[in-house]
């Protein structure tokens, strides 16, 4: 959970998470185990990865399609890293990542109420958008 917290808001692969665990945590773990843990965390609604948005299936622009990793609630990532308010105030980059997670969480709640979805966008040139909200609003009389 600590490694996932360090990579939330990114498109980190299982290999990246595995390397982070090997570097920063004790013990060795296989990629199958990491995958199983992530699946279990998804099933109990602790994490919810955000899919990539592709504006045009026939576009010549290479769009990155990896999911962005997020905790359902940013406080879970903060707790996993053992951080407190002073830690976040003194590390504004980390604070910004958790703030982004909070914004994504709220956008997902609002979009879901409108039968919508939230995606991210990033192309090969580095152009990115943290949140693309798609909602279909149909009013029937």
Predicted regions and their residues:
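Accessory nucleic acid-recognition modules appended to NTPase machines
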Residues: 1-139
């Amino acid at each position: 959970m600590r490694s996932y917290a360090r990579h939330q808001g990114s498109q980190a692969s299982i290999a990246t998470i595995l390397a982070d665990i090997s570097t920063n945590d004790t013990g060795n773990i296989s990629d199958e185990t990491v995958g199983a843990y992530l699946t279990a965390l998804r099933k109990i609604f602790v994490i919810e990865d955000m899919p990539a948005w592709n504006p045009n299936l026939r576009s010549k622009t290479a769009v990155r399609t990896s999911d962005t990793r997020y905790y359902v609630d940013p406080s879970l990532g903060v707790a996993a890293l053992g951080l407190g308010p002073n830690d976040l105030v003194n590390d504004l980059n980390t604070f910004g990542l958790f703030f982004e997670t909070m914004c994504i969480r709220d956008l997902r709640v609002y979009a879901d109420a409108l039968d919508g979805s939230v995606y991210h966008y990033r192309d090969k040139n580095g152009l990115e958008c943290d949140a693309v909200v798609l909602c279909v609003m149909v009013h029937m009389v």
